[in-house]
């Protein structure tokens, strides 16, 4: 009964705020005579009023300039995810449920006043019985239930974002699906503990100057995470003050190198370096916290992405096109196989899909590469030369052609866009393309080893696929390889002539 009343109350709050927003939009359209519109500041205020999951959604949006206009991303970075602390009796209830004891009985000392209190949880300072200082991350009561309720409104929010023209290039429902997927993963603190332990192992093995907190497994549960206390200010605090952190160039170089090495060579990386999750010590050293979003990367995906990133960072036109086509072959193959399976009598539909893809590539790829080369030759702001924005422009190109990029590629771009946004704001003279080239040169021998690592079994050789289905996939794969060679030859020769 309590849960039902809470859910109903949450519905009324969300409904009231969203209705006010919709009415304002349509008043602007009817009486203002123009397009429906909501300013970046108004959107931030709406999300802050809604709180909870909507604040998390805004934080995701702030890191996606490929989805949202830049002025909205910058405004949403300032979202105030600050809420009153969990009431003492509720905090006691959480500990009694998780441990069967009060906080003061679990720890030698437990600071009741949290260091930070956000919509999904809060962090306390404490000391273990053994005397070690720790950070205790406690999930707020009813977070999972509230998120399940809020998720029902996100499709409506997606409609509003499309109606106001804020979301661009993609269907807002795609943004919503991505948000729900990652947020559900963040709600399990034991999963985050596994991520932190694996990242710490990678840091120690590779001797990177990055601090990852040690997890205390015996104290941690699905709703309470106990980890080593890491000193420092968040990168977000510097962002809001618009002042660079100490030793900013080295800090960002260390962060980029760590994320690249983790992705390409370890095959597991911290996929959410949001400014609120990056700690900076007084000496300028780097710490990473909140590893709720981390991901594995297949060897085959790492190889393709490595070739692609190297080509883009070095302005290698021919290799950029070639590696881009390699990356989209797998999702395109899946689309074509699905069409062939569902509509075997309509092979023309499959041919149409392939031709649509070719036409979109031909129409747009040349102008993109020419603009990149112009920015590179003429100097200009770092924003125009950012490899991260090049990646997203290519991904958007594939999206407009009806091709979903591989999840590993999208997650890579999302991760480095988070870094890119902070770098361009705090250290605008930081040369990201040069940093990438230096990384590839430094670890050239590692890339040779990666190229020599066997790929996973091709889709059409999977043991659970037999007969006609396997034959269709194999045939389509061969056809796409032919398509790639034809398109590459035709497009490169045409663009090279236009650039000369």
For each of these PLM feature ranges, what is it?
Residues 114-118, 216-220, 410-411:
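A short beta-turn/loop motif at secondary-structure boundaries
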Residues 276-280:
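Hydrophobic residue at the +6 position relative to the catalytic HRD Asp in the kinase catalytic loop
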Residues 126-127, 273:
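Conserved beta3 strand of the Hanks-type protein kinase catalytic N-lobe
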Residues 1-122, 145-174, 431, 448-456:
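N-terminal accessory/targeting segments that precede structured cores
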Residues 5, 37, 221, 232-234, ...:
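Helix-rich C-lobe and terminal helical cap/extension of kinase-like folds
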